[in-house]
Amino acid sequence: MDMEWNPGFTIRVTVDHGAVLLSANRAGLRSLSAQLAALAEETPGAHIHYDEHNALEEGSTELIVEIRP
């Protein structure tokens, strides 16, 4: 799956009191929406890893999104 990012994207994922907060600017949300739409076309078990080394802001919590059957 091709991971494309809109210019200037920022995305942060944090966990606070058991709640996951995903916050992003417009470019980040557009990037995520395109990637999630592409993931929806994959086979069950396909997944995307997001972390501070490939997409998220420094200090973010790793996020894995997976498609289920």
Place the predicted regions along the sequence by residue:
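Positively charged, low-complexity terminal tracts
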Residues: 1-69
